[in-house]
Amino acid sequence: MNRHTNMSTELQKITEQIKSFVKERDWAQFHNAKDLALALSIEAAELNECFLWKTADQGSVEKIQDELADILIYSIIFADKYDFDLKELILKKLDKNKKKYPVDKAKGSAKKYTEF
């Protein structure tokens, strides 16, 4: 089994654990596109809050990890609910980003693709 297969298998296992967690609590009834998108946004805001009024290296690593995990969990729930293939989505988006941000224009630059 290669590394990518292991990652896919591990992601499937994690997805099943998340689904089991949700099912045991009967929370799937609340998981629609609007509420999942809002939950993702709120968790992203909580991640931002870890850095509010602090320098980038002053955030609590444990709190940052918790918020990042929440974002990933909601992303996995969203993808599973709507039968999105996360691997396919990520690779497709990376391909789009490669076209938007060609190395010769984007390397070392923080500009948005519309500014090239």
What kind of feature is each model-predicted range?
Residues 2-68, 72-116:
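Flexible "arm" and connector segments at domain edges
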